C-alpha cells in the first residue's frame, strides 16, 4: 500500500498498538526548556521515576530569559525561578543543557537543527507549540503538553493518535523579494487558521524545494498556525548539505548509511492525501497580517478587508473584533499605516539568512523617527557569532536598532521585551493574537525584509520597491 511521508514516519515508530486503542510511539529526541519542564520533573520526583533515556534529551534556556543580560542572578521573579529549576533538573538527571554560559544556547527550534540534533526520520517532541519547525528535515515533530513532557521523560514514548495527511503544493517559482515567510502566510491566508486541523501537512512543489533549510524551517514552524499537528518537507540534498558536519550528525560510514536511508523518506507517487491545497508561487505578494490571527493576512498590494462584505457570520464577527482591536478601518491601505516598534527575531525568523535579509534593507539607512525601538534578536549564540563575523551587528546598530543576545524575546510577553499598550509592531514572529507581545499590543506579522523596511521608512512598504544594499 502506498504511503505518505507522514504515514511512513508514524508507522516506523509504533512501539505497541492494540486494536481500538491509541498507538504508542517511540520518541527519538526530546527537547526541553525552562517554561514547560519544571512541573514534569516534579512529577518524576513524586512518582520516584528516573529519566529513561538521558542521551536523547537536550535542554536550553530561551522563553523567559533576558536578551540584555547573560547572568541568571540578574533575572527577576518567575524567569529566575524557571531558569534555576531547569539548571537544577538537568544537573540532577545528567541531561545536556545549553545554558546562558554557552554560545550554543538559543531558541530551542534554532539550537536543535544547528547542533544536528534534528535529523530526518526522527520523532521529535518539545513542550512548545512550534516544534513543527523540525519537520523541515523530514522529521515527525510536534509540540506536547507538560504532562506529556513527564511521560516522555519517564518512558521515551508517547500515546499518539494517527492524523490525516494534507499536501500543500506551491507550484512554480516565487518572484524576487518573496520569502518563505510570505509563502507560509499566503498558505495560512488561503486555508484559514483552522484549515489544517487534524492533519499533518507535507509542503512540496518547486517553490518549497528552492528554499534553503532556514526557509523550510520558517514554513514548517507556522504549520501549527493553520491548525496542523505538524509540518513536513521531504529531505533532499539541501537537507544533507546543511546537516553534514554538525556536532550530533552521524560521521563516516554512519553518515553514508544515514543518507541512504534518508533518501527513502518521501511520499510514494501514488500515495493518497486526505486534503490537497495548491498555490501558484507567482501570485504570492509580500504578506502582512491585518488582524489578530495569522489567517487574517493580505498582500501588501491589497486593502484591509471589509467585514460587511463577508457572508459567513463567524468570519464576519471575527474580522470586526480583530479590526477594533488592531485599530484599523476596512479598506485601509497598509502602506499608509505607521509602526511604533519593530521586532526581528523568534523561532520563525532569527537565523543567519533572516538577519542577512534585514541587514540588506537597513544598510546605509536610519531608523525612522516615529519608530520608538527596533529589536534585532539572533536565534542562538552561534547565529549571533556568525552575524558579528559578517558585520551585520554594525549595520543594525548604525541604523539605530538594538542588537541583543539570543532568546525568544518579544515573540511573547513572557520576558522583559514587550510592547507598550496599543503600540503597533512589525514583527517577524509567528503569532499576532491579542496581547501576544504585551498587554494590548498590536502585532503585524511580516518577513525580515518587510520588518526592516518598516523600521527605516516608519510604516509598511512594499519590499519589492526598496533597493537593497
Swiss-Prot record:
InterPro entries: 3-IsopropMal_deHydase_lsu, Acnase/IPM_dHydase_lsu_aba_1/3, Acoase/IPM_deHydtase_lsu_aba, Aconitase_4Fe-4S_BS, Aconitase_4Fe-4S_dom, IPM_dehydratase_rel_enz, IPMI_cat. Binds 1 [4Fe-4S] cluster per subunit. CDD domains: IPMI (cd01583). One of its GO terms (biological process) is L-leucine biosynthetic process. Pathway: Amino-acid biosynthesis; L-leucine biosynthesis; L-leucine from 3-methyl-2-oxobutanoate: step 2/4. Keywords: 4Fe-4S, Amino-acid biosynthesis, Branched-chain amino acid biosynthesis, Iron, Iron-sulfur, Leucine biosynthesis, Lyase, Metal-binding. It holds the Pfam family Aconitase. Gene3D superfamilies: Aconitase, domain 3. Disulfide bonds: none annotated. One of its GO terms (molecular function) is 4 iron, 4 sulfur cluster binding. This is 3-isopropylmalate dehydratase large subunit 2.
